[in-house]
């Protein structure tokens, strides 16, 4: 480290160098999420053309060479010379940060690409990028590459290899962008077909009548190569799709309005489930963290249904209103806002911050819902939802009393989790870990083998409830979940507060068999339904205990999957001993520490949510009440012909 610090140490990153230096600031990460965010940035631009009425078809193609191509039949990026910079507008868009046509509503009424950095960021982080523009019967093309400066040895990001050129005549119109992510930037440059396809399908739902085509040229099976999506019902079709594996108890409520320059689109459908699922978007961009539009929607739902319940006498004059949670139980909703100047929190656009959106969005939703509920045609539906909410309120009140009793009991007992939780001595939550361990036997080994300075152990005695099939009061009555909730310290549901989390890592440690997998699924379902922020903030992990121990003399190799076993046997050589672990309890404390708990050598799998809608559907299918969808899913993805591909070890083999 330098001993002096002066003006000469201040670096000025010019052009796209800043993007390559700190890619996470622009796309979130250099892992899978950031890699796919590159596609979304280009697709957002194509979507903006469609959302503003200029494009009718958008294609996304994953090429065999690892590149991605996005095409629309919109107006095409302007090809004339920029008056200030003296180069084509295409070159400006792809080489200048904060350059674009979306900073006012002259060219786009609604846009997800307000920041003006999407196209240039993708260029900066690509090995190469080619733009084709079809405009005024002319085909234009320009190529950019991230090259190495022969003088300095530094990488020049997104360098134009030549000016924009006319390469032919055409009757086509629109823009085509093809880019190949740079392996010098990303941990892995392989695009996952399912992630891209699901997002393309989602965009088709959000853009009624626009045709989307997704092609994966890498796919071996013809039926997995090309997918076309076009939905004339728009978000009404979307909520039906989201509830495919649930039991809907109403038809969708759908309304749309334009007021004060704000576009409001909402679709609601109720099911017989106990959880709510609200998916919000702004200008086609998902807002998984919500924002002012989602808050406005929830407020309007609460007021509209409470007012209606009072009008029909379901809530008496002296009785308190029901909570919003009561009216949203079993609700699936798609909430869409078209905002002229959206203010997102960060370039990855997780939350809408425009304060002016809330009063307008709320007023529209309240007005539309009130009219709907008062319509004589909808009385049966409206009364059914009110009755469902009243039942939910009773359950919520019972749950509240149960929590108060539990808190009072905990306050009276010096150590409410004695005999269950083995706490760590460290007081810094950001350094501490909680292992949720299957069974008392493994729990005992984990307690002995752990580093008690920062590792706490919570053994699970028996199998917890499948919360997908239970109400909140039933969840709180389960001893295993009560212990877990108390240990974490965050509360659950509407009372969840992540700032009170006592452990930075929550690690599920179960056997590598069917029972262990079921326990993992049950715990993940609980976290997803009642502590989702624990997952989205990256605190939940799955421990990976070894399947095999191969040893000879003083040399030992642990194998964490079947594929690693042959190499381990070859490395150890003749005369080895082989042990297969069927459960955590078969390992002594030292082995459990060495293989599964020691931060220097263990393997952990972090649990993330890449696609909220797909995660919800899979939890519903695998953990819900309907048998047929689960059987269909298992039939499609489980390999019943799989056999152990190892043979008994004989003395001659050794």
Regions inferred by a protein language model and the residue ranges of each:
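Conserved short strand/loop->alpha-helix "switch" segment adjacent to the catalytic nucleotide/phosphoryl-transfer site
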Residues: 21-40
């Amino acid at each position: 480290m330098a001993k002096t610090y002066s003006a000469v140490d201040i670096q000025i990153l010019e052009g796209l160098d800043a993007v390559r230096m700190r890619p996470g600031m622009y796309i979130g990460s250099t892992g899978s999420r950031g890699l796919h965010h590159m596609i979304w940035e280009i697709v957002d631009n194509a979507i903006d053309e469609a959302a503003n009425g200029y494009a009718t078809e958008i294609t996304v193609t994953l090429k065999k060479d690892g590149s991605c191509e996005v095409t629309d039949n919109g107006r095409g990026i302007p090809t004339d010379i920029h008056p200030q910079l003296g180069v084509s507008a295409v070159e400006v868009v792809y080489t200048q940060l904060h350059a674009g046509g979306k900073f006012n509503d002259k060219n786009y009424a609604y846009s997800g690409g307000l920041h003006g950095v999407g196209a240039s960021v993708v260029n900066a982080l690509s090995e190469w990028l080619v733009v084709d523009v079809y405009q005024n019967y002319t085909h234009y093309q320009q190529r950019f590459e991230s090259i190495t400066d022969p003088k300095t040895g530094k990488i020049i990001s997104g360098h134009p290899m030549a000016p924009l050129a006319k390469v032919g005549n055409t009757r086509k119109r629109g823009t085509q962008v093809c880019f190949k992510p740079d392996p010098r930037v990303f941990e892995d440059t392989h695009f996952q077909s399912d992630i891209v396809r699901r997002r393309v399908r989602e965009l088709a739902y959000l853009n009624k009548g626009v045709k989307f085509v997704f092609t994966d040229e890498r796919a071996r099976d013809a039926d997995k190569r090309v997918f076309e999506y076009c939905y004339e019902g728009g978000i009404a079709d979307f909520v039906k799709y989201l509830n495919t594996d649930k039991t809907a108890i109403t038809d969708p409520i759908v309304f749309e309005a334009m007021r004060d320059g704000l576009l409001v689109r909402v679709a609601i459908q109720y099911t017989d489930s106990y959880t709510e699922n609200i998916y919000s978007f702004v200008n086609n961009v998902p807002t998984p963290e919500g924002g002012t539009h989602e808050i406005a929607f929830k407020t309007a739902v609460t007021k509209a249904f409470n007012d209606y319940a009072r009008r029909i006498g379901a809530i008496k004059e002296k009785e308190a209103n029901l909570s919003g949670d009561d009216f949203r139980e079993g609700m699936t909703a798609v909430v869409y806002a078209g905002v002229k100047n959206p203010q997102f929190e960060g370039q990855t656009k997780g939350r809408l911050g425009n304060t002016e959106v809330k009063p307008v969005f709320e007023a529209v939703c309240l007005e539309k819902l009130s009219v709907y509920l008062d319509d004589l045609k909808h009385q049966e539906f409206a009364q059914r939802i009110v009755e469902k909410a009243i039942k939910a309120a009773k359950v919520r009140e019972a749950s509240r009393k149960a929590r108060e009793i539990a808190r009072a009991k905990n306050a009276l007992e010096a150590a409410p989790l004695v005999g269950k939780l083995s706490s760590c001595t460290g007081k810094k939550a950001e350094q501490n870990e909680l292992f949720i361990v299957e069974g008392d036997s493994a729990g005992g080994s984990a307690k002995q083998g752990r580093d008690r300075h920062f590792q706490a152990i919570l053994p699970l005695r028996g199998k917890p409830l499948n919360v997908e099939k239970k109400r909140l009061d039933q969840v709180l009555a389960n001893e295993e979940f009560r212990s877990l909730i108390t240990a974490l310290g965050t509360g659950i549901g509407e009372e969840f507060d992540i700032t009170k989390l006592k452990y930075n890592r929550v690690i599920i440690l179960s056997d590598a068999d069917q029972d262990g997998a079921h326990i993992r699924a049950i715990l993940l379902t609980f976290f997803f339904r009642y502590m989702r922020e624990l997952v989205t903030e990256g605190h939940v992990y799955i421990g990976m205990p070894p399947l095999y121990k191969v040893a000879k003399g003083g040399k030992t190799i642990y194998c964490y999957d079947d594929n690693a076993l042959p190499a381990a046997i070859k490395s150890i050589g003749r005369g080895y001993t082989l042990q297969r672990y069927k459960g955590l309890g078969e390992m002594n404390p030292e082995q459990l520490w060495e293989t599964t708990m020691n931060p220097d050598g263990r393997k952990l799998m972090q649990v993330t949510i890449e696609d909220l809608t797909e995660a919800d559907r899979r939890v519903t299918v695998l953990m819900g009440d309907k048998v047929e969808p689960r059987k269909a899913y298992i039939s499609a993805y489980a390999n019943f012909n799989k056999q152990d591909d190892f043979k008994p070890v004989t003395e001659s083999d050794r």
